[in-house]
Amino acid sequence: MFGTATSANATRVLLLGSGELGKEVAIECQRLGLEVIACDRYADAPAMQVAHRSYVLDMLDGKALEEIINKEQPAYVVPEIEAIATDKLVDLEEKGLNVVPTAKATKLTMNREGIRRLAAEELDLSTSPYRFADNYDDFKAAVEHVGIPCVVKPVMSSSGKGQSVIKTEDDIEKAWDYAQEGGRTGAGRVIVEGFIDFDYEITLLTVRAVDGVHFCAPIGHRQEDGDYRESWQPQAMSENAIKAAEYTAEKVVNALSGYGIFGVELFVKGDKVIFNEVSPRPHDTGMVTMISQEMSEFALHVRAFTGMPINKIVQYGPSASAVILGQGTSTDIRFDNLAKALAQPQTQVRLFGKPEIDGRRRLGVVLTRRKTIEESVQDAVENAKKVKIVY
């Protein structure tokens, strides 16, 4: 049963993280008359612009987080980012707080170590070879064990921050320094991953709901500098590869438990899949579902965590997303040439409303639906380039 937003009987949703993904979750909550409270470390974040009210805080501060939760008494706490005081959420969940999908899932996936150990050591899923390191000497030993080339990532980071590839021994020290600069909570533990041979990588959006586990069509994507640039759906896969991907994803989400959508990242080689990572929330590559599906990943997430059935996920056909990427320094961001970007049918633009930029930042996305994946991706990329960012 839902109450009415802003009334005494309101059903409240507290968003922890208010970026572009949180913004779409907030909009889907609004469609159901839920009262949305958005939190982030900076003011005027995208989800705050469509929420009933908002708070600015360091979400790694457990005391500050608990104060807001006690004040707002939310029916659902919905994390959108990794950098949250997860130990506090675990404590509060034991006292009755409803964390989406669960506080355990949020804590385990907060860093790459928890989820990698779950997948490889508890669930016995295929992963790349890996080692963890806390200091430079252990890091060098980890690189030697895994072998060159290898990938280095902070155990806690997002959007490719702190991630690099070691191709020669000359890269080792630089990779360590870069990882120490890029972690969400500052310097610390890293994962060294061995290179694996794969044909392509996918995100398998997997919904755990009251009526079972459901799968979206696989999403292919292209990464650059550790961050996605384009995604498309459906990614062509063999029947055996799809079965293997769904088996792996279902095993992971059932181990994490709770209701909601999970972005399961997999490498695919022929009919074989290798587990990479999972996010217990909507995934950035899944923004393509805003044009490719009857229910976007955000609508599916809200429907699932509020205890409603999913029934059937309908996919409309070849679709793509391409990032509108800004680079500069400004608190006065404007966009021009939108009419040119929208000149073709079945094309949409989403501008995130980020209030500032300092360096490189994802500011929007172009969505397309065409007769083929190739056309969809090409048109999405070309139309994204037409959007002129004025700083």
UniProtKB/Swiss-Prot annotation:
GO terms for biological process: 'de novo' IMP biosynthetic process. N(1)-(5-phospho-beta-D-ribosyl)glycinamide binds at E20, L21, E80, D284, K354, R361, R362. The keyword DNA repair does not apply. Keywords: ATP-binding, Ligase, Magnesium, Metal-binding, Nucleotide-binding, Purine biosynthesis. Residues 117-306 form the ATP-grasp domain. One of its GO terms (cellular component) is cytosol. Pathway: Purine metabolism; IMP biosynthesis via de novo pathway; N(2)-formyl-N(1)-(5-phospho-D-ribosyl)glycinamide from N(1)-(5-phospho-D-ribosyl)glycinamide (formate route): step 1/1. The keyword Metal-binding applies. Pfam families: ATP-grasp, PurT_C, RS_preATP-grasp-like. Mg(2+) binds at E265, E277. ATP binds at R112, K153, S158, S159, G160, K161, G162, Q163, E193, G194, F195, I196, E201. Its EC number is 6.3.1.21. It comes from the Bacteria. GO terms for molecular function: ATP binding; magnesium ion binding; phosphoribosylglycinamide formyltransferase 2 activity; phosphoribosylglycinamide formyltransferase activity. It catalyses: N(1)-(5-phospho-beta-D-ribosyl)glycinamide + formate + ATP = N(2)-formyl-N(1)-(5-phospho-beta-D-ribosyl)glycinamide + ADP + phosphate + H(+). Involved in the de novo purine biosynthesis. Catalyzes the transfer of formate to 5-phospho-ribosyl-glycinamide (GAR), producing 5-phospho-ribosyl-N-formylglycinamide (FGAR). Formate is provided by PurU via hydrolysis of 10-formyl-tetrahydrofolate. Belongs to the PurK/PurT family. PANTHER family: FORMATE-DEPENDENT PHOSPHORIBOSYLGLYCINAMIDE FORMYLTRANSFERASE. Homodimer. This is Formate-dependent phosphoribosylglycinamide formyltransferase. It comes from Vibrio parahaemolyticus serotype O3:K6 (strain RIMD 2210633). The lineage of its organism: Bacteria, Pseudomonadati, Pseudomonadota, Gammaproteobacteria, Vibrionales. The gene is purT.
